[in-house]
Amino acid sequence: MFIQVIEGKAKDPEALHRQLEIWERDLMPGAVGYLGSTGGCTSTGDCILVARFESPEAAQRNSDRPEQTRWWQETEQFFEGPVRFHDSVDVQVMAHGDLDEAHFVQVMEGHVTDRDRAATLERESDPILSEVRPDLLGAVTAYFDDREFTELAYFTSEEAAREGERREVPGDAAKQMAEWQEVMKVEKYLDIKDPWLVKA
């Protein structure tokens, strides 16, 4: 899997959402290898779009389409200031349910201190989380060459996610979560309360 993360400050979040709807209607049918996307904006206008493709080549073919170029030229005017792009083929997916059914998405960004250990912890915690956090539908994590990462956690609802955060975690799970926090140094959270989810 290949992931492209696009981030920036929105002048008009609703206009960005409309542009995504236009892409879904008019451009998605011709996007061969497209697997879906997640997007949205925080209450302060920080926006993120995360597109998933089968491969970097599929993403590049989509990017090379003239209609894609025109669409992006129209879309970027709704951002304020520079837009950041981050690409990765180092992607880890954890799914306990249908991610596209999420009503709340929390984005975590930061630096990973030990990539291999992070992968092991995620695999080990998967069955535990599926039991102790039924509100968590799953997560998608993209690791980048500069040791940065972007993780998207998909929840049934914000209310359920907050309740899950307050719930006491069993000993083994608590130990793993503490180690995860040491390995995955989160520096930024984005709470997407109205996620834009596009199915392929």
PLM features: what roles do these ranges have?
Residues M1-V50, E54-A200:
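Short S/T/G/P-rich N-terminal loop/turn motif that feeds into the first structured element of a domain
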